[in-house]
Amino acid sequence: METSSPALSVALGVMAVVLGLTGFGVYQAFGPPSKELDDPFDDHED
């Protein structure tokens, strides 16, 4: 059986981290925690 190259392992690790951070960002922006976010334009009515 052929062993995987270190570059492939690093690439898959980086891809997993990027996808995890993207998923966390989408969850923060549109999930339940988004109710706590403030809109700065609503805070400064003229």
From Swiss-Prot:
Domain of life: Bacteria
Function (record text): May play a role in photosystem I and II biogenesis.
GO cellular component: plasma membrane-derived thylakoid membrane
Primary location class: membrane
Gene Ontology BP, a term: photosynthesis
Segments passing through the bilayer: 7-27
Coiled coil stretches, renumbered: none
Alphabetical UniProt keywords: Membrane, Thylakoid, Transmembrane, Transmembrane helix
Similarity field: Belongs to the PsbN family.
Membrane topology, as annotated: Single-pass membrane protein
KW DNA-binding (keyword) present: no
Protein name as it appears in the record: Protein PsbN
Record's subcellular location: Cellular thylakoid membrane
Pfam family for this entry, one: PsbN
